Amino acid sequence: MKKYKTGLVLLVIALALLVYFSPWFFLHIASWQKEFNQLISENLHQIQNNSIKAGTTLIFASFVYGVLHALGPGHGKFIIASYLSTHESQLKQSTILSLLSSLMQGIVAITATTLLVVVLNLSSRYFKLSQLWLERTALLLLVFLGCYWIWQGLRAYRKKAKLAIKSLNPLPLHEKSAVKNNRTFQPNTCSCGHQHLPSPTQTAQATNLKSQFLVILTIGMRPCSGAIFVLFLAYMLDLYSWGILAVLAMSFGTGLMLSAFAGIVRYARNTAIHLGHWYSSKNTKGKSESIVKLIAGGIMLFFALSLLYGTTISTGGSKILF
């Protein structure tokens, strides 16, 4: 108990310091991103002269750029934090989720640039339009994810607590049957020995897999602008393969930082659960989890609709489609 209280106090102090220094921190993050963006551009130009040295520096600079990109503000951390706050997960599972989400961003950027620029050779105007629709698709997925969590929260909140048997005390048997019974029964199976319906654990696992898939798609469908810039520049310099490697390194750096962030969120959730265990019952725990999921889904839905509306507002110039 004392360990969790100490961890909670340290976490609150860290969050307070982060909020206090966030303007300075994000300003410097943006400045460092510009510097590494310039470094990436310089090394792409130098690869033709010294491919090994410039290429190694390019990959390293792209990796650091991905780390800085993850440290700055973004929708990925918000989605990951919302998911891990409302769903029980293991550390390995949350790490894989963060890495796959970041890798999905890189794959979408590479696929979109390859298809529209390299294969179809479309103009930058059409490419910007495709970026806009990718962003809208990601926001529509975010709307769906928010509605899905709200529905899950409402269903869990209305669900009545089931009666559970805490212990069974068998009576002593004075006589033992001479017939040996070799039949064993597994939970969630009928007398024929087959499982006809999924167990509660399997159902919960399938539901979590759906949510995880939606999280990966929602984050991945909105590629990083830095990755798009690197791919465009690499294509113009006829170094597209180096651009792909740089984007993959960028995605890996982003994924590592998101994994660290996911570990912090998971620790905070477990700490809150352990502290609440002393003054809450199983029924109130289920109700509080459903309320948290409702709030997270509502906030996600609000921001998704606001950002989606923002994509329909013209900021100057004409658009091919709304």
From Swiss-Prot:
It is a multi-pass membrane protein. The chain crosses the membrane at residues 7-27, 54-74, 100-120, 137-157, 228-248, 294-314. It comes from the Bacteria. InterPro entries: Ni/Co_transpt_high_affinity, NiCoT_RcnA. GO terms for molecular function: nickel cation transmembrane transporter activity. Keywords: Cell membrane, Cobalt, Cobalt transport, Ion transport, Membrane, Nickel, Nickel transport, Transmembrane, Transmembrane helix, Transport. GO terms for cellular component: plasma membrane. The keyword Transport applies. This is Putative nickel/cobalt efflux system HI_1248. Pfam families: NicO (PF03824). Signal peptide: none annotated. Efflux system for nickel and cobalt. GO terms for biological process: cobalt ion transport; response to cobalt ion; response to nickel cation. It is found in: Cell membrane. Belongs to the NiCoT transporter (TC 2.A.52) family. It comes from Haemophilus influenzae (strain ATCC 51907 / DSM 11121 / KW20 / Rd). Disulfide bonds: none annotated.
